[in-house]
Amino acid sequence: MKTIRYPLSKKVLKMKNKVSLIIAVYKRVDFLELIFKSLENQTFRDFQVIIAEDDCSPMVKHFLEEKERNFPFEIKHISQEDNGFRKNILLNKAMRVADGEYLIFIDGDCILDKNFVEDHVKNAKPNVCLFGRRVMLDPKTSERLVKTKDFKYLSFMKLLFTKTGHLESAIRFPFFISWRKTGVLGCNFSVFKEKMIEINGFDEDFTRPLFGEDTDIERRLTLIGVKLQCSKFQTIQYHLHHPTKDRDEDWKISGELYERKVKEGKSVCDNGYIKR
C-alpha cells in the first residue's frame, strides 16, 4: 500500500481537523473532479479528505498533486493494486490514517450538495450512525456534468424534466427527521471512529460488492447498541450514472456470506481493522 500525505494549504494550517471524509475511488478521475468541485462549495469546511483508491492510477495521483496546491483542505491519498473487489480492505486502511474523530464515508461517483458535510456534522451524536440516500442521475445529465462541470444541471427544476431517479431525495428539509431506521448505504453514512473500531471496522471476508460495506456494518453497529438515523432530505448527494456489470452472482455469494455472519451473531469481525 502507498500512503501519500499532501501538505496543508495556508488556509487551514491552524485548523484542527476532527472530521475525516473518506472517498472510495476507482479509476474515474472525471468523477473525482466533480466531487472536488462540490467539496470546494461546502458550507462546513473544517475536515480532511482521504482518497481511498482501489487502484494505483498515475492520473489520480497527478490530479491530487495538482489539486492540493490550492485546495482548502488537507488531502491524504492511499492506494492499492487493482486485484479485484477489495473495498473493505481499502476502507480499513483509510480508517487507520484518518485523523478525524468523526468519519463520513462516500463513494467516488457521488457529487455532494453544498450542505452535505455540514448536515452530517450537525447531526452527529456519540451513539448514532447517520445514513443518507442519493439522487440517481440519468445518463444524459451525468454526461453533461462530466463535460461541462456546470452544477446548474443539478437544479431541481432541470432534473425534474430528466429521467433522474429518486428526485425526492434532492429536496432539502434541514430540520426534518426521517422515520426510517434501517438501510445504511456505503456511499453516504457517518459515525464516530471509536464505534467503527469497536466493531473492528469493515469485514474483509467480503470480497464481493454488496452487504459487506454497508448492510453488515449496520448489523454490527446495531449489535453494540448504536442507533441508526436516516438523514434523507439532508446529506444530499447525486450519483453519477456509469455502466455496471451484472450483479446476480455478487448478490448470491455476498448474500450467502452475510447470512452466515448473521447466524454467527458477532458484532466484532475477526478479519477487519485489526486481525484477530
Question: Where on the chain are the PLM-derived regions?
Answer:
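Short aromatic/hydrophobic "clamp" motif used to bind/position activated sugar donors
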Residues: 103
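Short beta-strand/loop segment that forms part of the nucleotide-sugar
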Residues: 46-56, 76-80
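Short, acidic, metal-binding catalytic loop of nucleotide-sugar glycosyltransferases
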Residues: 37-46
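Short, flexible, basic/aromatic active-site loop/helix in glycosyltransferases
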Residues: 150-182
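A short, conserved alpha-helix in the catalytic core of glycosyltransferases
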Residues: 188-191, 195-200, 206-226
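Glycine-rich, basic loop-to-helix element that forms the pyrophosphate-binding segment
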Residues: 81-98, 115
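A conserved acidic beta->alpha catalytic loop
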Residues: 38, 53-64, 110
